[in-house]
UniProtKB/Swiss-Prot annotation:
Organism lineage: Eukaryota, Viridiplantae, Streptophyta, Embryophyta, Tracheophyta
Family listed: Belongs to the terpene synthase family.
Binding annotation for Mg(2+) 3: D452, E456
Organism of provenance: Gossypium arboreum (Tree cotton)
Keyword presence, Cell division: no
Entry protein name: (+)-delta-cadinene synthase isozyme A
Binding site for Mg(2+) 1: D308, D312
GO terms of molecular function: (+)-delta-cadinene synthase activity; magnesium ion binding
């Protein structure tokens, strides 16, 4: 059996015929072997000592007593935006708890900047602070006061705070329209570094941005602010570079695994996007303690991409039936019923999950992999239904298409698999909760699915024979493409409100669990706003990979 499989896998293009197959034209991978070589990850003793001393200084400053708790807000905000808050989670939580308790006492005389900053920071940490605090910035007619238009810093904070809104907070819906218009008008008149802050915010809000990308950007802005704290800035720069070294080491290991699989030669119809996949998973969790989870989840997303392309871009429907059956049975013996080229991806898929089980066995956590397998099986079952529609030339209703398209986004699978490589915070109850289609996972899935649908239709990224959610909606409801985009965007915005709502205390699950769905939604906002930035690697992916994985920060 093993020798037979080896002979099959050794063939470069086993039994691949182009007759009656779907056609896809993916551009080749753009990174080559750039990340194969692992950089030196050792740091000298002097830098390590400085790093620990600076960390202690920052911790002390977070906890330092002040007369007015609002004075702490800008420093806590800087710690978060510079990307180092993961070192001080308990200290920040304690300080914000105190600020939340003092909110009513300190609210009367606060300006727009302080009110909005406090609102955003507390909401980011799940405190259910009321948006009524913004009513005092409205005039008798119910509009935001004209005097606010000259307070650019305050407008910027109100703009960012508005992205924390939940359902029913009309004042924040109004605030985002008001601040977007006013900041856009003010932008040409601003000077550095405020101009950079406003310009970037209008393109990417804090709430929906990828934390590492945003940290890299904010470091360059923060160092030019007159009010910057030198110790905090230096600590953030060293921390960024240390994390970059860790991430490069992980990516080097993954790229060697990918190169050994040789899919670019053996399965030339599939996308070569392992670096982009790692960048995606860095967005899900970047912290050092999730190193194992990152490596496992990157391999899973890489295999999911290959499987997706098999269903969507190469295999015939008759081949997909036994392929789906083999994945459902999850048994290497099922390889015998598959075409030779499918054996390659099937064996690799099973190997990835077997490796996960081996890595988790010592911790007694291998049970988690069973949940991940079930999630992958549900994904391919949804892929098969979509392939069946195409094969039968069946045009589903929008509701039929949507109900199957949510699973085919892969986001429920990724959310569940992300839990596998996390620590003690994950229990069997976590997976049972995830399997119940909780609001936050469903919301992040809708964001993924609908942003993908808009991107594919708007930028002509789908093949003519493919079903399209936008086309289904246009045909069923007799609307234009733009009207369909608008409707989909309403669902996306509503889903972001659901995500925000699920973070308000008390929560169903611990924050680290909820953060996986939040971060999955953030990846979509960054990579898919201007098209499918994964398949057709665009500016966001290239820029993010370059800034996070290639260019260190000059210290």
């Amino acid at each position: 059996m093993a020798s037979q499989a080896s002979q099959v896998l050794a063939s470069p293009h086993p039994a691949i015929s182009s007759e009656n197959r779907p056609k896809a034209d993916f551009h080749p991978g753009i990174w080559g072997d750039m990340f194969i070589i692992c950089p030196d990850t050792d740091i000298d003793a002097a830098t390590e000592l400085q790093y620990e001393e600076l960390k202690a200084q920052v911790r002390k400053m977070i906890m330092e007593p002040v007369d007015d708790s609002n004075q702490k807000l800008p420093f806590i905000d800087a710690v978060q935006r510079l990307g180092v808050s993961y070192h001080f989670e308990k200290e920040i939580e304690d300080e914000l708890e105190n600020i939340y308790r003092d909110t009513n006492n300190n609210d009367a005389d606060t300006d727009l900047y302080t009110t909005a900053l406090r609102f955003r920071l507390l909401r980011e940490h799940g405190f259910d602070i009321s948006c009524d605090a913004f009513n005092k910035f409205k005039d008798e007619a119910g509009n935001f006061k004209a005097s606010l238009t000259s307070d650019v810093q305050g407008l910027l904070e109100l703009y960012e705070a508005s992205y924390m809104r939940v359902h029913g907070e009309d004042i924040l819906d109004e605030a985002i329209s008001f601040t977007t218009a006013q900041l856009t008008l003010a932008l040409p008149t601003l000077h550095h570094p405020l101009s950079e802050q406003v310009g970037h915010a209008l393109k990417q809000s804090i709430r929906r941005g990828l934390p590492r990308v945003e940290a890299r950007n904010f470091i360059s802005i923060y160092q030019d602010l007159e009010s910057h704290n030198k110790s905090l800035l230096q600590f953030a720069k060293i921390d960024f570079n240390l994390l970059q070294l860790l991430h490069r080491k992980e990516l080097s290991e993954i790229c060697r695994w990918w190169k050994d699989l040789d899919f670019t030669r053996k399965l030339p119809f599939a996308r070569d996007r392992v670096v982009e996949g790692y960048f995606w998973i860095m967005g899900v969790y970047f912290e050092p303690q999730y190193s194992l989870g990152r490596k496992m989840l990157t391999k899973v997303i890489a295999m999911a991409s290959i499987v997706d392309d098999t269903y969507d871009s190469y295999a015939t429907y008759d081949e997909l039936i036994p392929y789906t059956n083999a994945i459902e049975r999850w048994d290497i013996k099922c390889m015998n019923q598959l075409p030779n080229y499918m054996k390659i991806s099937y064996k690799a898929l099973l190997n990835v999950y077997e490796e996960m089980e081996q890595l988790l066995a010592n911790q007694g956590r291998q049970y988690r992999v069973e949940y991940a397998k079930k999630a992958m099986i549900r994904l391919v079952q949804a892929y098969l239904l979509e392939a069946k529609w195409t094969h039968q030339n069946y045009k589903p209703t929008f509701e039929e298409f949507r109900d199957n398209a949510l699973p085919t986004s892969g986001y429920a699978m990724l959310a569940i698999t992300a839990f596998v490589g996390m620590g003690e915070v994950i229990t069997p109850e976590t997976f049972k909760w995830a399997a119940s289609d909780p609001k936050i996972i469903k919301a992040s899935t809708i964001i993924c699915r609908f942003m993908d649908d808009i991107a594919e239709h708007k930028f002509n990224h789908r093949r003519e024979d493919d079903c399209s959610a936008i086309e289904c909606y246009m045909k069923q409801y007799g609307v234009t493409a733009q009207e369909a985009y608008n409707e989909f965007n309403k669902h996306i915005e509503s889903s972001w409100k659901d995500v925000n709502e699920e973070f308000l205390k008390p929560t169903e699950m611990p924050t680290p669990v909820l953060c996986r769905s939040l971060n999955l939604a953030r990846v979509m906002d960054v990579l898919y706003r201007e098209g499918d930035g994964y398949t057709h690697v665009g500016k966001a992916a290239k820029g993010g990979i370059t800034s996070l994985l290639i260019d260190p920060i000059q210290i």
